[in-house]
Amino acid sequence: MVTIVFDHPAEDFPELKIAGEFTNWEGVPMKINTSSGKWEYKFDESSVTKHNDKDKVHFKFIDQNGNWFADDEYPKEVDEHSNENNVATLNNEEDGGSAGEEKDEGDKTAHNTNENGSELYYEGPETPTPSLKGNVTFPSPKTAISQDGSAFAKETTRKERKYEHAPLNEVPVERDPKEENKELSPNFSQEQTENKQDKGLDNLSEGNDNDNTRVNEDTDVTDTQESEHEINGSDTENTDMSEQEEIQKIDKPADQNAKSIVKEGDANTEDYESVLKKLLGALGRFFGSWFSWLTTKMSSSEAS
């Protein structure tokens, strides 16, 4: 008898069938072996037709949903219809044998090709475990020098040798330059702030002096231009020569006094008021004489 074992727990499949050359490819229910707890199927070798004196049999499993599949625990082989089936070798002894017992031997011979040239499934030998034994020596951390940081490693080694035997209180303490900069930065920033404040006060005082000077100069020039414009405007009027001479005689002292006051740059309001009063008086006399002359001329023209 030949026994085919489904090498998985029986509870994974509530129902399992097998079909192969020994069942004429019809699904036949498998049975659970109570001792092993796995699905099994037994058949007689006489029910199998041997092809070309090769002791092997092809088969597939069928689950509870009717799906046909080949199990990975058995070697696989593709038939002439491109169907992938499980294959198991048979025992030639008279007392029979088990396909499950011969499964390992079938794995070793599965690399042989069948009659149609199809190659059997074969995983190959296992990779040997590499040995870690050897005479490899690793350099110590103090003497190891890398290609990228050889100079740094040498400098570190020299420093370690230098302070190797020195007492702890004599070993110089290297200070971080960043900390020194942090200690100096407050004094430096305070001096900069004081210098900036002094410069700002000096610039502010100079700006105020310049503004006062400009205001005085602009005021003097404006007053001079206004007075000259008013005087020149009075001289260009079409008046009688005699009246113009009298007006000029009267206005000249006032103009001279106004110009002298303006040139001196006195900013008192009383002086400006007196100058304005004199100018207004001169203008009033001028317009009064001009008006009298105009009325006289108009009356004479009407009489003629």
From Swiss-Prot:
Q: What is its main location?
A: endoplasmic reticulum
**Single GO cellular component annotation?**
nuclear envelope
| Matches recorded under InterPro entries | Ig-like_fold, Ig_E-set
* Residue list for modification Phosphoserine: 140, 185, 205
Q: Which SUPFAM superfamilies match?
A: E set domains
Keyword list, A-Z: Endoplasmic reticulum, Membrane, Mitochondrion, Mitochondrion outer membrane, Nucleus, Phosphoprotein
Polar residues: compositionally biased ranges = 129-149
GO terms under biological process: nuclear envelope organization
Matching entries from CDD domains are given as:
E_set_AMPKbeta_like_N
* Topology of this chain in the membrane: Peripheral membrane protein
Where is it localised? Endoplasmic reticulum membrane; Mitochondrion outer membrane; Nucleus envelope
Q: Region Disordered: list its residue ranges.
A: 72-269
Ranges of biased composition (kind: Basic and acidic residues): 73-83, 155-183
| Quaternary data | Interacts with ULP1.
Under what name is this protein listed?
ULP1-interacting protein 4
* Name of the gene encoding the protein in the UniProt record: UIP4
